[in-house]
Amino acid sequence: MAPQLLAWFETSGRKDLPWQRDPTPFRVWVSEIMLQQTQVATVVPYFEAFMRRFPDVRSLATAKLDEVLHLWSGLGYYARARNLLRAAQAVVARHGGEFPATLGEVMALPGIGRSTAAAILALSRDERHAILDGNVKRVLSRWFGVEGYPGEPAVERRLWMLAEACTPHARIAEYTQAIMDLGATVCSRARPACLLCPVNAGCVARAGNLQDRLPAPRPRAVRPRRQAWLVVAMRGGHKVLLERRPPSGLWGGMWGLPECPTRAHAEQWCREYLSGAHPPRAGEPLKHAFSHFDYDMRPLFVRCLGKAEALRDEERYRWYDVRQPARVGLPKPIATLVARAGEEMDDD
C-alpha cells in the first residue's frame, strides 16, 4: 500500500496547509488537537489566529485559560483547549520547554492519545510511528475488509496491527499525511471516490461492494435530550451577566449564562440574585447538538439594575459588555443568546 500512496501523495496530497509550512512539533501538535472532530477548512483560520498569539509552547504555557478559550470559541470540544494549556505547562515544567522525545512521554501529556502522539512525532520528526485516527480506521477497514465497529477493543487491536504493518520505514511524514488525506478526500464516509483511489486494486470493500458496510457504524443508542432555562440578565450600558462554568463537564471553564432546570427556578433565581429586576420574558428556544446528546436552551430575558451581593465574586460572575466584548471563552450558543440580548438593548 505505501508505494502507491506515496506516489499518489506527490501529485494529489495536501502539502500547503499552514502547519505543514513549518512543521515544528508545537505547530503540528496544535493542528492535530484542533483537527480532532473538526474539518480542515474550519481549523485553518483558528490555527492561524492561535499561532499569531501563541507562536511557541512557552507563550502558551503562560497564557490565561480565558484567552485560550476565547481563541477556541466556535471550534467546540472545549476540553481540547483546556488540555492543550495543561500540556503546554507540563512541557515547560517537565521538559524545559522542549517537546518530549519519546512516544510514551508525549502520550503522558494531557489530552494526547496514542494516535495523536504518533502523528505529532511522524509529521514533525519523520519518526516511524503508526497512526490510527478516524480516517485511517476507515481506509484500513475497507482495504483489509475488517468487520465490526472500530471502537470495539478487538477490532481496534486488529486495526493497530494493520496500521503498524503498513507503515513504511522511510518517508514517514509523507506516508502519514498521505493516508490521512486519502481517508479525508477519497475514501470518505459517504460516496467514496473509489475510481480515484490509488490502492483500489487491492481493496476488499471495493471488490465486494461493501463500502457502505465498512467500517461498521457505532451501535445505535437512544440519543438523550437535555433541557435548561438560561437567565439572560441585562442592565444599562449593554451589559449581560455571565457565570463561569465549573472547570470540568459541559463547556468546562468557559463563560455561560446562569442555568436553571425549569422556568419557575429561573424566575426565582432572578428574584433572589438580581436587583431591580423587571418581569422576565421567555425568548425563542435555541437547540444545539453535542456529540452525545441534544441540548434545548430556553432563554429567560430580564432587565435589571444590577446583581445581588451574593454574586460579587468577579471570578465567577461578571458583566459582559456586548459592545466592547472581553476576550473570554464563550460557547457559540451562548454567544448567540448574548447577541440576541445586545439586539434587544439596541432597540431601546
Tell where the protein language model's regions lie, with residue ranges.
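Intrinsically disordered, low-complexity, charged terminal extensions of DNA damage-control enzymes
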Residues: M1-D16, Q20-R21, A184-D348
